[in-house]
Curated annotation (Swiss-Prot):
The lineage of its organism: Bacteria, Bacillati, Bacillota, Bacilli, Lactobacillales. PROSITE patterns: MRAY_2. It is found in: Cell membrane. Pathway: Cell wall biogenesis; peptidoglycan biosynthesis. This is Phospho-N-acetylmuramoyl-pentapeptide-transferase. The gene is mraY. Catalyzes the initial step of the lipid cycle reactions in the biosynthesis of the cell wall peptidoglycan: transfers peptidoglycan precursor phospho-MurNAc-pentapeptide from UDP-MurNAc-pentapeptide onto the lipid carrier undecaprenyl phosphate, yielding undecaprenyl-pyrophosphoryl-MurNAc-pentapeptide, known as lipid I.
Length: 319
């Protein structure tokens, strides 16, 4: 546990030192987030806020994880796979953010380009897992444990791509995705500690350290956004952690807010295409509550509480 706390501190200190520099650099070069037209009108005042903060906490977490695991002689293939998930999806987000900044509009990679890259990273993770004699066993409700490489591969790809996008959808308010991710990684850190999975524990704690530093600059009013470089990386990392702890379904509760955010978008699109009517005032659902008059802080606090409750329920029943 002491080593994981050191990983937390290394990541926190590195991030805390680098964020001010990144903010100053972006402001001096007039680089900042362009707010999408279809979002709430009052978000337009956030236009120009520095972004790509995810690059800092992702790299800091990776450095801390490698340093501590290497020092302890526990730099296993599982740790490398988790880093591939974090860095792989982070690079996709970095490319997306870079295009947004270059063209000065809130568009980046085309949807098909982003999806192809996400599938490519997921496929790479599956191949790495296969080379490590990973147990391709998947528990299915009402069917029990099923050992089928093809089925597990499809599930793993869906899980990685799905949750990387789910966290991305949740990153729409100051501090929201940061707090939710901190809670989720904290839950998995505890599960890894209980199961004595050193590599996963260090990885989760390192990510938490970076997020703790980032929150100092991302709470309302945000001085910097994480961008897709952060949100895609966090989601991919969470999915990978849940899989390599042998608890993939846990993410439905631990990441319940991410699931609800994604479901709200799917339901909204399906309803509008089939009936011409919208279920929510705006999606993802955090914007719906904004449209009802909730402040950003109220949405943050309520959603964080839901995330805590979801994680708490999982830990009480299955932890």
């Amino acid at each position: 546990m002491q080593a994981s706390l050191i990983a937390f501190m290394i990541s926190l200190v590195l991030s805390a030192l680098l964020f001010p520099w990144l903010i100053i650099w972006m402001r001096s070069h007039d680089e900042g987030q362009q707010i999408r037209d279809e979002g709430p009108k009052w978000h337009e005042k956030k236009s120009g806020t520095p972004t790509m903060g995810g690059t800092v906490f992702v790299l800091s977490a990776a450095v801390a994880t490698v340093a501590i695991c290497a020092y302890k002689g526990q730099l296993s293939k599982t740790v490398w796979i988790l880093l591939v998930a974090l860095l792989g999806y982070g690079i996709i987000g970095f490319l997306d953010d870079g295009l947004k900044l270059f063209f000065k509009r809130n568009l980046g990679l085309r949807a098909w380009q982003k999806m192809d890259l996400q599938l490519l990273v997921a496929a790479g993770i599956v191949l790495l897992a296969a080379s490590d004699n990973f147990d391709f066993a998947l528990y299915l409700p009402f069917a029990g444990v099923v050992k089928n490489v093809v089925l597990f591969t499809l599930f793993e790809v869906f899980w990685l791509v799905g949750f990387s996008n789910a966290v991305n959808l949740s990153d729409g308010l100051d501090g929201l995705a940061t707090g939710l991710s901190f809670i989720a990684y904290g839950t998995y850190a505890w599960l890894a500690f209980k199961s004595q999975n050193f590599g996963v524990l260090v990885f989760c704690m390192a990510v938490m350290g970076g997020l703790a530093a980032f929150f100092m600059f991302n709470h309302k009013p945000a001085k910097i956004f994480m961008g897709d470089a952060g949100s895609l990386a966090l989601g991919g990392g969470l999915a990978a952690v849940s899989i390599f702890l042998g608890r993939p379904w846990s993410l439905l509760l631990v990441g319940i807010v991410f699931v609800c955010e994604t479901a709200s978008v799917i339901l909204q699109v399906a309803s509008f295409k089939t009936t011409g009517k919208r279920i929510f005032k705006m999606t993802p659902i955090h914007h719906h509550f904004e449209m009802l008059g909730w402040s950003e802080w109220k949405v943050d606090l309520v959603f964080w509480l839901v995330g805590l409750v979801g994680s708490g329920i999982y830990l009480m029943i299955w932890g």
